[in-house]
Amino acid sequence: MSRELFAPLVRACRTVDHTYVFHRKGSVWGFVKLIREIRQTQFDWVLDLQGLFRSGVLCLCSRAKNKAGRSDAREGARWFYPLKANLPQKGSEAHALEILMEFKRLFDKQPDGLKPLTFDTTLSESNRKPLCDPPLKRLMIFPESRRTEKEWPFFQELTGMLLQQSPNLQLVWVGTSPIQPTFHAAPHVQSNRFVNLSGSTGIEELPALIGSADLVLANDSGPMHLAAAMEKEVVALFGPTNPNQYGPWGQFHNVLTAPDGDLAKLTTEQVGKTLMQKL
């Protein structure tokens, strides 16, 4: 089950056989149709990993031998399924992925041993072409996040600085909205050292883009978690959110945390130094 926004990415994941699409802002009739679609299949297990009212209703209405959800479910969802995955020993302070891995115990498995996610995705010709020229090292930059206070404000300054200081580095911007460079980008675009793909990629292209990079730089965001899930090295910039709960899984050593939770206090020089050490 996936929101329409993420469905193309979920479909591309090699571990997924079928995707049901949930329209978050859809009508009540659309929700009823989704329930009918789900009920056409008899499942062995249905797991509610989100733990909210609507996901709980979908779990309740499904035809499954076993139905399970989160013990910390909200909005009354915990009453919709007979089986529950307990919180890990750290409780609600555990990492979000640690909480979800507790579902493995329902299948007599230990909550560890995750394998990297793999995808069947390709890039469009227009996006693939500027990424074909070796032998430059490639830094993939995702400047956006879901909330403004989680966005580091110095990506423009950092990009300009790295282009000046690192002639053997290609920098690629990726984002949902078009971002115009404020630095003098023309010569770097002509030499293919700066590639601006912001506003021109589909979500299903993200795995191919991330896979082509030597290093990823991102805020606390979906692309950061995707890079970590693919086991691609990612430098993650954290402000108000707690990296112990939401940091890149398996790469907590690559987290740069802003003083006082204020990303404006994380300097360009600090981030640039960390990147160059890893490149």
Predicted regions and their residues:
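Catalytic machinery of carbohydrate-active enzymes
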Residues: 1-279
